[in-house]
Regions:
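A short acidic, amphipathic alpha-helical/loop segment
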Residues: 20-25, 87-89, 113
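Structured adenosyl-cofactor binding patch, chiefly the S-adenosyl-L-methionine
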Residues: 112-161
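Short, hydrophobic/glycine-enriched beta-strand segments
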Residues: 3-11, 96
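Short amphipathic alpha-helical molecular recognition features
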Residues: 14, 102, 106, 126-130
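S-adenosyl-L-methionine/SAH cofactor-binding core of RNA-modifying enzymes
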Residues: 31-105
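C-terminal accessory extensions appended to soluble enzyme cores
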Residues: 65, 143-203
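Histidine-anchored nucleotide/phosphate-binding helix
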Residues: 14-30
Length: 203
């Protein structure tokens, strides 16, 4: 059975960075839910039209928290968890839950509210990841059964825009076959366009 990937949306707004990430997650997983969407938030049309994307105004606690059997099959990806995610977790869990935004720099403990709800936590290693990277790594571990430490990563890569302009990303990424960090389509252009802004302002 395919896995479900949920991001609990913890903001009143949805910036371009998050939109590109969420479109990528929906395309890659084919089963992506954005939960706790405020009724006042108008989602971008491209995101709503992306196959595999589901918008949910209810929080994950309301959807899964009432039934102990269902709740036990939900894994919270939590930087503070004691146990690392492992391939065996693909047998234990059907739903993987992420507290958006994982990609804050410096990291804020956005996951604490979900942690309080009692979901089982797993950690994705010591380095901060963007949300789409966290989902990608979770899929590699639980669906492809590749251990965390065997995944090729690029930590804090430098993006060169031209001879004079570059920026260093404060995150860990999965390394693509071309040797470059795997990022959402359009993300490098967004970063280049907004390179005068702080990374945190793009979310």
């Amino acid at each position: 059975m395919g896995k479900t990937y949920i991001v609990e949306h913890l903001d009143e707004e949805l910036g371009q960075w998050s939109e590109l990430e969420y479109i990528t997650i929906a395309r890659e997983t084919g089963n992506f839910c954005l939960s706790s969407i405020p009724s006042t938030l108008v989602l971008p049309q491209e995101l709503k039209n992306t196959p595999g994307f589901v918008a949910e105004t209810r929080g994950v606690e309301e959807v899964y928290g009432q039934d102990p059997v269902l709740k036990a099959r939900v894994c919270l990806l939590d930087p503070a968890a004691k146990q690392e995610l492992s391939p065996e977790d693909g047998d234990l869990f059907d739903v993987f839950l992420f507290g958006g935004i994982l990609g804050d720099d410096p990291p804020r403990d956005r996951t604490s509210e979900l942690r309080k709800k009692g979901f089982t936590g797993r950690r994705l290693g010591p380095k901060q990841m963007t949300t789409d990277t966290a989902v990608r790594v979770t899929r590699i571990v639980t669906e492809q059964r590749i251990p965390l430490d065997d995944i090729p990563y690029l930590d804090f890569p430098e993006l060169k825009f031209n001879e004079h302009e570059s920026t260093q990303m404060p995150f860990r990424y999965v390394k693509g076959d071309d040797g470059k960090p795997i990022m959402p389509e359009g993300m490098i252009d967004l970063i280049r366009k907004d390179s005068d802004k702080a990374i945190d302002d793009l979310f």
